[in-house]
Amino acid sequence: MFKNLNKKECPKRSKKERKLIFMKITLKDGSVKEVQKGISVLDLAKEISEGLARNATCAKVNGEVKDLRYNIEEDSEVEILTFDNSEDGKKAYWHTTSHIMAQAIKRIYGNSVKLTIGPAIANGFYYDFDVKENISSDDFEKIEAEMKKIIKEDLPIERYSLPREEAIKFMKEKGEDYKVELIEELPEGEEISFYKQGDFTDLCAGPHLMSTGKVKAVKILSSSGAYWRGDEHNKMLQRFYGISYPKASQLEDYLNMLEEAKKRDHKKLGKELELFMIAPEGPGFPFFLPKGMVLRNVLEDFWRDIHRKNGYVEIKTPMILNEELWHRSGHWDHYKENMYTTKIDGVDYGIKPMNCPGGMLVYKSKMHSYKDLPIRAGELGLVHRHEKSGELNGLFRVRCFTQDDAHIFCLPEQIESEIEGIMKLVDKVYKIFGFEYTVELSTRPEDSMGTDEQWNMAEGALKKVLKDMDMPYEINEGDGAFYGPKIDFHIKDSLGREWQCGTIQLDFQMPERFDLTYIGEDGEKHRPVMLHRVIFGSIERFIGVLIENYAGAFPTWLAPVQVKLLPIADAHKEYAEKVKEELEEVGIRVEVDARNEKIGYKIREAQLEKVPYMLVLGDKEKEAGTVGVRSRKDGDIGAMPIDEFIAKVVEEIDTYAK
């Protein structure tokens, strides 16, 4: 079917081969294959390796995700995707399982349920149904059994298209009103594709696996209410969440991780450890409690210190700014639905959803020379963004949060060195917290500002730095900001879950819109380039991630209470106060449990509070001037001179010990 192209000239072919039309396929590893025109992705995978073909779920053809059944008609770059080697590979697998679940539910409940949408998501899939009566979780087992039956049937999955009117008629005959609505809203000329497996057909763009039997281990996880299209004014639907894997052992590992994640839920631990609360009077607006404020302030102090050492200055911009500013920045046109607004003296104002426009005004407040650049201006800025009620989630999804923004204004020739500097800073910060991370490059979205030349230059600069730093990265097509491409950092927590936190965005648009200038060596005005970047992202969200990553047991330097003093009896309280003073003199955060309770009870309480160190103080310790040290991590360490204990804790704090 194909030959390796190891020479520039085409190889000699037989008469039969010369009648065929061949084309060149460039694979991910850079190797070039010569194949027959019109070959399917699946057949290409088989020619490469039977094992690859067995595990393949879809492919990227010239950057676009395609079915295995897709026929390649021209010279192309092709990457065969599997469940294990890419997110797109997982999504095809999970999207197919979503259809299997929908088919099972339709088989069981028939016309009493109507199909809406059922996409793959970050971890698994969901499908929303319009149901006459809510389906109980007691029925999950029955639905899973039907799913397994469909998988065992190994139904071929076929893709076909229909003209608009035929597609509408087809779905009307099936009574699928939501699908009719979706078809009617598709742009003229848009392909209307369907996927069929046995007695089930769904409107879908794909991609999907070749048959239902390719799915192996499945589980329905939960169900909840969800408004049609996320609009609270629409009908409430029932959403079913599920997960699937190629191996039963993978599913078992995932379910075990979910059980552990429940124990680490930041909403649960936030309440137990008295870190934060969400009041019904302020949905999406978190309240930080005293211990939570200690944690937050430690993080912000750490942020300020490390940025000062890396050449940043700190600014603070107002929360409410005139509507005209948001028109100038482009937010009013591209982001207004997420903004809160108000009127002052009859004039419209916007409550800032982002810090950047304020940063533009700070730069513009004085004239700059090329000698001043780069200027690195950081801001811990409180922003507000409207989120729908059903999407709010503890500290992970809120309506107000503090973003650790920085805006770097630089010369064009400084772009690459500044991006590299940011990446090194991000790496340093994440390593302190013990996070591994992956990198993703997000390219131009449909709703963007600027010229093709500007976007190509910006994307090229980001790619060059990633290449020069030997940084592996995935491309996320079309997910850049409206004003420029971006690099996203996804940290991995102790449960293996990924969280998108850090971002670097290259922006040629804002300096243009705000007429930012500097005086060059030639004495003329020039336009600076601007970089947006965050490391934590949202302080609130990052705290939520930390709570779950550490299961509330923060390392000593982060812990709201670092040491708990436990006097055994009233006679030891005075000594406890003396020890407290010595610890506080060097900045150690300490509390005394002076209650008239048994020492075992006090120890258990301190352990539940996840305090790193407990110091038991009795007659022996008082007479010897020592402390009885118990570590959250190592248990009973024994007696230790106060100075020695202080030195141990201070070293842990100063070195950000994990």
Where are these predicted regions, by residue range?
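NTP/phosphate- and nucleic-acid-binding module
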Residues: 18-116, 120-658
